[in-house]
A protein has these predicted regions:
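Bacterial N-terminal signal peptides that target proteins for export
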Residues: 1-11
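A residue-level marker of the well-folded mature domains of exported/periplasmic proteins
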Residues: 3, 23-313
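C-terminal segment of classical bacterial N-terminal signal peptides
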Residues: 15-24
Length: 313
């Protein structure tokens, strides 16, 4: 056998470089823990994250509990993700306080956390990629007020009172109505856990209790679809304003059952989350908030290219 020391050295160096590259690829693992999977919204966020993973050459996983009521399950998922010692992680909190002990653990282990969609009550996240939910819900209030003639009774069917999105959308809507429309009375705020069946039942009970109700705001995809179904089942004429999109909501707007809705930019949220996580692993400075934008859409602009770009089925 002819031994070539130079060749052996080259092979050795190549193998070492290969190992380093493999280790680096393994290090660049970024898990995203979302609030759920039951809404098409989260599938759209995932598609943005997957695209960013391709563009930035990192490995991304995307998971969430079956429903947005499963706070404990989400915490378990977060714990498992941190245990894998990822390069960074993305987190959309169901309960903005419940996750704090684990987020402190991530911080102690120098794992950058990027909050997305729903922030947490802490300065641990290096940034939050999200819609300005208070401003978006305030716009929803303006639209609903105009549609009912700026007077009468309205209600809110919210998805929860524990997440940042749930609180901000509720408060943004309620505060705007109270400050700008003195002749409009918010008769009740009810919670349907973002589940369309629960939100349907909540809506029906509201309609029974308030026969003069003129409008309802549903704060996310499941809530809004539940409101539409409840109003349809009760055969009532009520102005409905929703949030997010999805086929059922879009169909309701086209048919006139729903007046319009606020859409976020879910693909953009997913993309910017992974992009920010990659930058955080490199020590790059990030803004505290990455505002991913929102739009009002109704029958008049649902087919506008600017709007169709941020809608999903």
């Amino acid at each position: 056998v002819i031994r070539n020391p130079l060749l052996n050295a080259i092979v050795g160096v190549t193998f070492a470089v290969g190992l380093t590259a493999a280790a680096h690829a393994q290090e660049a693992y970024i898990p995203l823990i979302s609030k759920g999977f039951q809404h098409q919204f989260w599938q759209a966020v995932k598609s943005g994250a997957v695209q960013a993973a391709k563009d930035y050459h990192v490995k991304v996983t995307f998971e969430g509990p079956e429903t947005e009521a499963m706070i404990d399950k989400q915490i378990d998922m977060l714990s498992a993700a941190i245990a894998k010692k990822p390069a960074a992680l993305g987190f959309a909190a169901l309960d903005s306080k419940a996750a704090l002990p684990l987020l402190k653990k991530a911080q102690a282990e120098k794992i950058p956390v990027v909050a997305f969609d729903s922030g947490v009550d802490s300065d641990i996240p290096v940034t939050t990629a999200a819609t300005n939910n208070k401003a978006a819900a305030s716009l929803a209030a303006d639209k609903l007020a105009e549609l009912i003639g700026k007077e009468g009774e309205v209600a809110v069917v919210a998805h929860d009172q524990t997440s940042r999105t749930g609180v901000d959308r509720r408060d943004g809507f309620v505060e705007r109505m109270k400050s700008a429309y003195p002749k409009i009375r918010i008769v009740t705020v009810q919670y349907g856990e973002g589940d369309q069946l629960k939100s349907t039942e909540v809506t029906k009970s509201i309609l029974q209790a308030y026969p003069k109700l003129k409008g309802i705001f549903g704060t996310n995809e499941g809530s809004a679809i539940g409101v539409v179904n409840g109003v349809r089942e009760m055969k009532r004429k009520v102005v409905i304003v929703g949030y997010d999109s999805g086929k059922q909501q879009k169909d309701a707007i086209r048919s006139g059952l729903m007046a319009g809705a606020i859409t976020q930019n879910p693909v953009g949220i997913g993309y910017r989350t992974v992009e920010a996580a990659v930058k955080a692993t490199k020590g790059e400075k990030l803004p505290k908030i990455i505002d991913t934008g929102f739009y009002w859409y109704d029958k008049t602009n649902i087919d506008d290219p600017k709007i169709t770009a941020v809608l999903y089925d």
